[in-house]
Amino acid sequence: MTSKPGSQKKLTPIVTLYALLAQIHRLDFSSRSGPASRNAWSGQGSGEVTVSREAAAFPHDGARQAAQQEAESVVFLEQGQFQLEGQSSSVNFHNRYRWQLAADGKALSLSHERRGRDAAVFLFDLVADSARGEDHFVSREAHLCIDDLYAATLVIVRDEAGNALGFDLDWRITGPRKDEHLAYRYRC
């Protein structure tokens, strides 16, 4: 993959991932509560992803805001069905996530906008995990939300010919009442 026709310059892994976001249309996920969890959130879900591009949201972090002021964001509007283990019926879910490429092209920020754009919650910056390969990414640092730590890994999934099919995003949430693993499978 090159940055423009005729160019031999290869896109950075994080820019490649950012370009893939616009192609996502479907998600499947599972949540597993570990032994220290007090939430009992184990279950399965699936749904559709509507992707849009918007002017960048400005998180309340001044340094981040200045660095990303001119950026555009990719927004995932997710909706579908989730079924808790042991339950006979499912419930509707919907989420709104904002993906934003850092001005230096070295990180991809993820924010959750469950309560709207003005109440966005920054989750983490994903950076390339070069030790594992160019399709592997990891949260730069765990995000602290009250007493809970959120961390993630992301892997681009490819077919035998090397074409991107989507990506797997695995979350780990730990804290005094949480011991959760979320496995999201986003596909084109």
Question: Predicted regions span which residues?
Answer:
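Soluble ligand-binding/transfer domains with enclosed cavities or grooves
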Residues: T2-R187
